[in-house]
Amino acid sequence: MAWTPLLLLFLSHCTGSLSQAVLTQPTSLSASPGASARLTCTLRSGISVGSYRIYWYQQKPGSPPRYLLNYYSDSDKHQGSGVPSRFSGSKDASTNAGILFISGL
């Protein structure tokens, strides 16, 4: 079954120059059924991913965005209502990126 959502990352509490954050995401990602996927969204230099809560949304064609989860740290995260636990968030300080893991595709 083809599952091709558009996943968006938003930063919370963006003020001043931070509202001009530049985010880079791969244009596409392919994975086999049953496999896992790792989607990244990298922040521009000068903005530390460690300082922000990362929000992930799923948007399918013709539908509004659906909130999946937000992630600040392992002890401070929130899963959206009805969103399966196979969706999880993380951060990678070494690449300055927010990460969305999806298992069991």
Curated annotation (Swiss-Prot):
Residues 20-105 form the Ig-like domain. Residues 71-77 are annotated as: Complementarity-determining-2. This is Probable non-functional immunoglobulin lambda variable 5-48. Transmembrane segments: none annotated. The keyword Membrane applies. Residues 1-19 form the signal peptide. InterPro entries: Ig-like_dom, Ig-like_dom_sf, Ig-like_fold, Ig_V-set, IgV_Light_Chain. It holds the Pfam family V-set. It comes from Homo sapiens (Human). Coiled coil: none annotated. GO terms for biological process: adaptive immune response; immune response. Residues 45-53 are annotated as: Complementarity-determining-1. The keyword Oxidoreductase does not apply. Residues 54-70 are annotated as: Framework-2. GO terms for cellular component: extracellular region; immunoglobulin complex; plasma membrane. Immunoglobulins are composed of two identical heavy chains and two identical light chains; disulfide-linked. Residues 20-44 are annotated as: Framework-1.
